[in-house]
A protein has these predicted regions:
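Conserved alpha/beta catalytic core and glycan-binding cleft of carbohydrate-active enzymes
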Residues: 1-159, 165
C-alpha cells in the first residue's frame, strides 16, 4: 500500500509531495532527458489533474491513468504539496533545457529560446500555485534559477556556494 495513503489516513494534517504532478508536468524523476506535458508530450494529463485537485477523490480524474497513485491518498487538499522541482533534483530550468529540445536548438534565436523557457516556467508554476494543494517552489525558480552542471545541492562543491551556504 502507498505510504502517502497510510499517512494521510492515519494522521490528519500530515502532507506529502506529489510526484504524480511533478512527473506529469516535467517528466520522470528517473530520466532527466525525458519530458512530459511541458515538452508537449501527451499522456500525463490525468496525473496533472490529480495534482491540481490536491490528490483527493474527484469525478473528473481517471485514477487508472495517473502515474503512480491509483487511488486518492489525501482526505483534504492541504495534505498535498504541489511542486515541479526541489533541492534533491534538477531545478526546473535545467530540467526543461535537458528535456525540451527547442530550448537548446541553436537554429532558433536566443531570444526565442529564452521566451519559450519563460513560458514553460510560467506554465509549470501556474499549475503549482493554482492547484488546491500547498504550493512549494524551489528558491530562485521565479528568476529562472539554474545550477548548471550540478543536479543537486549535495553534488555541488562547497566553494561554489555563496557565503550563506545556499546555491
Amino acid at each position: 500500500m502507498n505510504g502517502k495513503y497510510i499517512l494521510s489516513a492515519l494522521m490528519n494534517g500530515i502532507g506529502a509531495f506529489s510526484d504524480d504532478m511533478r512527473d506529469g508536468l516535467r517528466g520522470p524523476f528517473s530520466d532527466d532527458t525525458k519530458g512530459a506535458f511541458l515538452a508537449g508530450i501527451a499522456g500525463e494529463e490525468e496525473s496533472i489533474k490529480f495534482g491540481i485537485v490536491g490528490s483527493i477523490a474527484h469525478p473528473q480524474v481517471d485514477m487508472t491513468r495517473v502515474n503512480y497513485d491509483k487511488k486518492p491518498w489525501a482526505t483534504h487538499p492541504t495534505q498535498h504539496i504541489s511542486y515541479v522541482s526541489c533541492l534533491d533534483d534538477m531545478c526546473l530550468v535545467d530540467r526543461l533545457k535537458a528535456s525540451v529540445p527547442s530550448l537548446t536548438d541553436t537554429s532558433k534565436s536566443k531570444d526565442y529560446r529564452t521566451a519559450e523557457l519563460i513560458r514553460l516556467d510560467l506554465l509549470a508554476q501556474t499549475a503549482v500555485v493554482t492547484s488546491q494543494g500547498v504550493p512549494f517552489m524551489l528558491a530562485g525558480e521565479e528568476m529562472l534559477r539554474t545550477r548548471r552542471v550540478f543536479t543537486t545541492v549535495s553534488h555541488r562543491p562547497t566553494a561554489s556556494m555563496s557565503s550563506t551556504g545556499t546555491t
